[in-house]
Amino acid sequence: MKFTTSRSTPSSVPRISRITKHTLLLTAHSAKWWADQGYIVVTADGRGTTGRGPKWDRAIYENMKAVTLEDQVDAVHALPDAIASLAAETGVSMPKPDLDKVAMIGWSYGGFLSALAVLDAPDAFAAACAGAPPTDWTLYDTHYTERYLGLDPATYERNSIVADAPKLSRPLMLIHGFADDNVTIANSLRLSQALMAAGRKHTFLPLNGITHMTNDATVARNLLLLQRDFLADALV
């Protein structure tokens, strides 16, 4: 696996920022693991994340699907100049990103964004691993969805990714726990069904007895290895 391969870790999650002075331990460990596999790991906080003011926060209202993806695409396009600038500033030699081999992986909203990336931005993202993605917002908690999508059913339909299934042209792995009581597995089943109906090849990994995030160290480790192997094949 060449070090010129890039990987984007989606972080444009409403209300959550990953780019902070003190990096979350779990985020740091995950990033280091992927870097050790030979990837450039990129984290980008887009519109809707915290710490940038009300206008930034509300930019995703009724349109989080388009806005959060747009910011991740912009981050990919900015990557070569950003790395060159950082190398010049620090005097440290850094690998050049291969923008033809950019993958996105994520969990929960990050899973939604990862699946969306290969469905709606295949020119920027060559593959994706989507864990526990909320593919249809009508299936999710109203206290969350109404804050960002309001009440109009048409808005929910517009921000769903199920209808985008026929667009899939890039490798996609779906991962979901059967016991997930946060984002129910019906979300991934619904997207997988739509992909099958459209004749779109994809990988679906259902996890028996696993909730939204696995607390089984062996399962967590094997999930990383399976995603790594999937991306190694997808990004050849």
Stretches found by the model and what they are:
Residues 24-44:
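Short amphipathic alpha-helix adjacent to the substrate-entry channel of hydrolases
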Residues 10-11, 40, 127:
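Short, Asp-centered acidic motifs that coordinate Mg2+ and/or phosphate
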Residues 30, 43-236:
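Active-site-proximal cap/loop segments of hydrolase catalytic domains
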Residues 17-19, 109-110:
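Acidic helix/loop microenvironments that form the catalytic cleft of cell-wall polysaccharide enzymes
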Residues 14, 22-23:
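Conserved HGGG/HGGXW glycine-rich cap/lid loop of the alpha/beta-hydrolase fold
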Residues 1-7:
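N-terminal cap/lid segment of alpha/beta-hydrolase-fold proteins
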Residues 7-17:
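Short beta-strand element of the alpha/beta-hydrolase
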Residues 18-21, 134-136:
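Active-site/binding-pocket entry motifs
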